[in-house]
Amino acid sequence: MGQNDKAARRQKIKLRSKTRGQGTAASPRLCVFRSVSQIYAQLVDDVNGATLLAVSSMAKENKELKGTKTEVSHTIGKQIGEKALAQGITKVIFDRNGFRYHGRVKALAEGAREAGLVF
């Protein structure tokens, strides 16, 4: 499978999943983006078109995180879960953004669940 095939497959899955679940203020969408070296997670309210919360491995407080990319992703998941609970958000819709539920995406989801988010 070539690089263009993978990108096209991801875009197709991304569009298909966006029509299924829209986030609200009470139950926002936990959107995950994974690059080659970094991972990003944000809580999105699709009704109002607003990002409620964002955490990434690029943030200043996360620059010193050590370990593998999967371990860092798990930590990012815990952080977004703790920050969401501090804002009173307990239930989210998980949007893997076309990425397979494996590796870093799975680690982020498990970290968020450990912190107390329900999805």
From Swiss-Prot:
<dbReference type="GO" id="GO:0006412">
    <property type="term" value="P:translation"/>
</dbReference>
<feature type="compositionally biased region" description="Basic residues">
    <location>
        <begin position="9"/>
        <end position="19"/>
    </location>
</feature>
<protein>
    <recommendedName>
        <fullName>Large ribosomal subunit protein uL18</fullName>
    </recommendedName>
</protein>
<dbReference type="GO" id="GO:0022625">
    <property type="term" value="C:cytosolic large ribosomal subunit"/>
</dbReference>
<dbReference type="GO" id="GO:0003735">
    <property type="term" value="F:structural constituent of ribosome"/>
</dbReference>
<keyword id="KW-0689">Ribosomal protein</keyword>
<keyword id="KW-0699">rRNA-binding</keyword>
<comment type="subunit">
    <text>Part of the 50S ribosomal subunit; part of the 5S rRNA/L5/L18/L25 subcomplex. Contacts the 5S and 23S rRNAs.</text>
</comment>
<keyword id="KW-0687">Ribonucleoprotein</keyword>
<feature type="region of interest" description="Disordered">
    <location>
        <begin position="1"/>
        <end position="26"/>
    </location>
</feature>
<comment type="similarity">
    <text>Belongs to the universal ribosomal protein uL18 family.</text>
</comment>
<dbReference type="InterPro" id="IPR004389">
    <property type="entry name" value="Ribosomal_uL18_bac-type"/>
</dbReference>
<keyword id="KW-0694">RNA-binding</keyword>
<dbReference type="InterPro" id="IPR005484">
    <property type="entry name" value="Ribosomal_uL18_bac/euk"/>
</dbReference>
<dbReference type="Pfam" id="PF00861">
    <property type="entry name" value="Ribosomal_L18p"/>
</dbReference>
<comment type="function">
    <text>This is one of the proteins that bind and probably mediate the attachment of the 5S RNA into the large ribosomal subunit, where it forms part of the central protuberance.</text>
</comment>
<dbReference type="GO" id="GO:0008097">
    <property type="term" value="F:5S rRNA binding"/>
</dbReference>
